[in-house]
Amino acid sequence: MLQNSELLQEYLPIAIFFGIATLVSSLIMILPNLLATKKYNKDKLEPYECGFEPFDDARSKFDIRFYLVAILFIIFDLEITFLVPWAISLGTIGKIGFFSMMFFLFVLTIGFVYEWKKGALDWE
């Protein structure tokens, strides 16, 4: 077993890496704000639409169903992120891992059927 000093030496390169990464990313975020010339112009603050004056407000209303479909997409996209590592390690996790994932898929299927029956996927 590693002693405390040996353990700290093992993690020292990782700590140095995170320190340098934090410093570089902070510099990248701060330096442009300090060094850039700031010329405020009315035209630069306008939304750009093919060189013409904007015809309409840039903010348009979306139907709430678009947000619902986006949330459903995120949920089922997360399902895939759980399925891929499970499928890769299926040979080593045994029956318990298999049946736990089947239960997970069953719960997601119940949720999908519920959304379908409630009409969340209908566009009419």
Curated annotation (Swiss-Prot):
**Role summary:** NDH-1 shuttles electrons from NADH, via FMN and iron-sulfur (Fe-S) centers, to quinones in the respiratory chain. The immediate electron acceptor for the enzyme in this species is believed to be ubiquinone. Couples the redox reaction to proton translocation (for every two electrons transferred, four hydrogen ions are translocated across the cytoplasmic membrane), and thus conserves the redox energy in a proton gradient.
Compartmental location: Cell inner membrane
E.C. number(s) listed in UniProt: 7.1.1.-
Keywords, ordered alphabetically: Cell inner membrane, Cell membrane, Membrane, NAD, Quinone, Translocase, Transmembrane, Transmembrane helix, Transport, Ubiquinone
Origin organism of this chain?
A: Rickettsia bellii (strain RML369-C)
What the entry lists under PANTHER family is as follows: NADH-UBIQUINONE OXIDOREDUCTASE CHAIN 3
State the superkingdom: Bacteria
The record's subunit annotation is:
NDH-1 is composed of 14 different subunits. Subunits NuoA, H, J, K, L, M, N constitute the membrane sector of the complex.
The similarity annotation says: Belongs to the complex I subunit 3 family.
Name of protein: NADH-quinone oxidoreductase subunit A
Of the GO CC terms on this record, one is: NADH dehydrogenase complex
Q: What Gene Ontology terms describe what this protein does at the molecular function level?
A: NADH dehydrogenase (ubiquinone) activity; NADH:ubiquinone reductase (non-electrogenic) activity; quinone binding
Annotated membrane topology is: Multi-pass membrane protein
Q: Which Pfam families match?
A: Oxidored_q4
Keyword Methyltransferase belongs to the record: no
Q: Where are the transmembrane segments?
A: 11-31, 68-88, 93-113
